[in-house]
Amino acid sequence: MISRVFSTLPNRASKSATAAYFTYKSWLQNGWRGCHSNQASVTMSDISVHILPALSDNYMYLIICNQTKEAAIVDPVKPDTVIEAVNKEGVNLKSVLTTHHHWDHAGGNEQLLSLFGKPLTVYGGDDRIGGLNKKVKHDDEFTIGNLKVKCIFTPCHTTGHICYYIQSPAGDQKMVFTGDTLFLGGCGRFFEGTADQMYSALIEKLSKLPDDTQVFCGHEYSLGNLKYGNHVEPDNQDILAKIEWSKTKRDANEPTVPSTIAEEKLINPFMRVNCESVQKFANAVGHPIETMTYIRRIKDNFK
C-alpha cells in the first residue's frame, strides 16, 4: 500500500518520502538501540562476509576476497555504516551488488557513490536502480578480486531482481545473496510477478545450487517465516528445531543468517512446493504452481 502511494509522487519527492518512512519504521522498532541486530562476520579461507544490519530488519553485506582485499557491498542502504566497515577492515571497495530497485536495498547507492570518493561499479538488473552503471542479466559473470560471481535472474518480487552466486577460486566455498527472493524460511511477496516466476526462481534455479551454498538474504524475517512454515507443516521437526535455534539467536540480538540451500529445502514451504505435505495444505496435490500461489496468498495475511 505505502509503495503505491509513493509511486504517485514525483521521483525526488517519492525518494524522500520513502526514506522518511523506512527511517521512522526503524526508529519505532529499534528505538534508541539503533539497529535490529548486532553486526557479525562469516570468515572462511578465501571469503569473508561482514553482516551489516540496517533500518528495521534489512541486511547489507560486505564481501571480501581475503587474498586480494578487494571488496563488494550488497544493497548499501546505509552508506555511513558501509564506509565505516570498509575503513575498519582496510579493504578496497570496488563494487556494489544491488539485488533490486526497492529503496530499502538500492536507496543508498547514489549517496555511497557521492561519499566514497572513488569510482564504484554498481551492478544490478533493473534500470530503476539508483546509480546503476553496469546492468547485468542471467548468467553474467564478473569477479571480486579472485572470487567468481555469477548473476541469477529471479524476477517476481520485482521484474529485475538479481541474486549473486559467489565462489572461491577452487569452488569449495559458495554463497548466494538473495535479496528479497529467498529468505530463511520464506520468500518475497509477488509484487511484480507470478507464482510461475517464483517457482522458477526457487525450484528451477536456486534449489539447483550445491546444498552447502550459504544463503544470505535481505531481511531478518526468520521467526515469522518459520512460524508460518510450522502452520503449513506442523509435523515438520526441522522447522520446529530451527524455530528454537532462531529464538536463541534473536534473544541474543544476533542475526539468523546465513542458512544453506540444504536447510531451505527442509524448512522453507516455498522451497517445498513439490512435497506432498505442503501440497496437501494447499489442497493441490500434484500441482506445485497452484501450491505456490495458495501458500503465498495465505502468508500475505498470516499473523
Please place each PLM-identified region on the residue numbering.
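Accessory terminal helices/loops
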Residues: 2-39, 203-214, 221-303
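Conserved beta-strand hairpin/beta-sheet module of binuclear metal-dependent hydrolase folds
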Residues: 33-92, 164-178
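Short beta-strand or tight-loop elements
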Residues: 45, 145-150, 160-162
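Active-site HxH/HxHxD metal-binding segment of metal-dependent hydrolases
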Residues: 56, 71, 78-153, 167, ...
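Divalent metal-coordination and catalytic microenvironments
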Residues: 63, 75, 100, 112, ...
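Active-site metal-binding loops of divalent metal-dependent hydrolases
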Residues: 76-77, 101, 127, 157-158, ...
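A short acidic, helix-capping loop that chelates divalent metal ions and anchors anionic groups
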Residues: 132-133, 185-191, 225
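Active-site-adjacent loop/tail segments of enzyme domains
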Residues: 186-212
